[in-house]
Every structure is written in structure tokens, then in C-alpha cells.
Amino acid sequence: MQELNTMRKKVFLLSAIAIGLILIGFLLFMGMPVIGMPLFFVGIIVSLVTAGTIGGKFTLLYKEIICREIIQRLFDVEEYIPKKGFDETFVKETHFISNGNRFSSDDYLRGYYKGIAFERSDVHMQNVTSNGKTTTTVTYFQGSWTVFTLPKKITSYMLIREKEFLSGGRPGGIFSNIPYTEKVIFEDIDFNNRFEVYAEDQHDAFYLITPVFMEKIKELEYMEDGRLIIGIKDEKVHVLFDNRSNAMEPSVWREVSGEDFKIVENEMRKIIRVMDILGLIPENEV
């Protein structure tokens, strides 16, 4: 812990210097561009160098000391690779989220809990556009993405997503790698108001999404801030929480403490909670 905090202080100091130079350079640029512009770019360089060197080392050490300890205590771990994530093609071909042109993924975890296999990673999908004068960045998804094997043998494609303004269109079709899907309406009005469901096979949708399963989906929604997305593809169920955060990343603005262990453990226990709510854990193992 002491080694982590010593490194954190160095990152904090360099980050503060970089931010200060950028702000001062920007302000001076209005009246004294000859001085302001160099300061601004020096601040950018300091920021990039910090992130690429000591900042990266601090993050990796944090994950090896804190994240790995929690993960190995809770799960039978086959792989935990902080710098690795889900493949961009894998994510985009699911069509569970809108596809952007900027993608990153890290904290790849593969393992078992009470014999149930899972994979998990943090995913960040954005779309960046520019008109030559201004650049606009829109975040489509930022959060955790976990994959489980579905107990019921559902081979068709299905998407269950919490409704929001401009939540995305219907997945599938001629120009997609997934089949055509139709919107499914259920008798539960409250469920229809809160979620939209698209399925390749409506019979599979009604077979899986029973009144009991609807309540489980609602329970998952209450479990986490942000938007819930559940996708089914190739007999796998994908559970996505778009909460615009990454609980596995350390903060340089506060000391590393026991609170960090709690934050990471809470994040990892969400995997167990999802398994429990969806009934993935065999009854004799609960």
C-alpha cells in the first residue's frame, strides 16, 4: 500500500503540473500567444508522458495488488489480464450497443464461480466526429460487460434493453451479421414501458422471458445505476451495465486505502449477484 501511495503522489504532482500549465497557457494565449501557446503544449506533453509512463505503472500496480487479490479470493480464476479486454470485433458483432469509431476494453477476467463459467471486461465505445473546426465525442457505452452460458438452450438472437431517449434502432437485417429481428410486446405493461425487446424468434422470447424472468430483469435494473442491457447470442447471455464508470481504475486524487478494496469487491460481487438473480447457479450450490 505504501508503494502504491508513493507512486500515486508522483502521478498526482505531475498531473497537477500538467493541468496548471494547460490552464495558464490557455488563459495567456488570449493576450500573449507567444508565451501561452508553448505553455499549453508543454502541459499537453507532460500529461501524455505521465499517462504513458508512471501513470500507467501506477494503474498496473494497483490492479496487481488490489484487483487481483479480490478476484482470486472470490473466483476460480483462469485469466485476469488488466491490459487486455474484449476484442472490438467481438463487441461490434453482437449489435447489443451502437457501434462507434473509438473503442477500448480492459480488465479481462475469465473464470468460474461454483462451476459456472464467465468472462468479464470493461468496455468503452464512443463515436468521434469533426467538421474541421470542432470535434464532437458521443459516448455510446461505458461500463462492465459480462458473459455467461445460458441454462436454457436458446440458439436465436435476442436483445433486452432498458429504454432511453434515442436508445438505438432494431438490430439485425440485410447489412448485419445477425438475423432480422422483430420487436416483442408482452402482457406486462410496466415491463413494456421500461424495456424494449427484439428477437429473431418470438417463440424463444416468450419461452425465456416469462413473468418470473421479467421480475428478475427488473431486479437487475434496480441493482445498478445506469442502463441495463441483456443480450443473447450463440447460447450465451451478455449482461451489460452502462454506468459511465470503471470501478477497476484507481484515482490519483485520493490516497489508496481499504476503501479501494471495498470498491473493487463490490464490483466483483455484482457478477455473483447477476448469477444469483438469473438463476445460473445450481440449486445445490446456492
What are these regions (language model features)?
Residues 26-44:
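Hydrophobic alpha-helical transmembrane segments
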Residues 39-64:
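Transmembrane alpha-helices and immediately adjacent membrane-cytoplasm interface residues
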Residues 1-10:
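Cytosolic juxtamembrane N-terminal segments of multi-pass membrane proteins
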Residues 68, 72-77, 81-286:
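Charged, low-complexity intrinsically disordered regions
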Residues 37, 49-50, 176, 250:
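Generic signal for short, ordered secondary-structure residues
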Residues 9-31:
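Canonical alpha-helical transmembrane segments of integral membrane proteins
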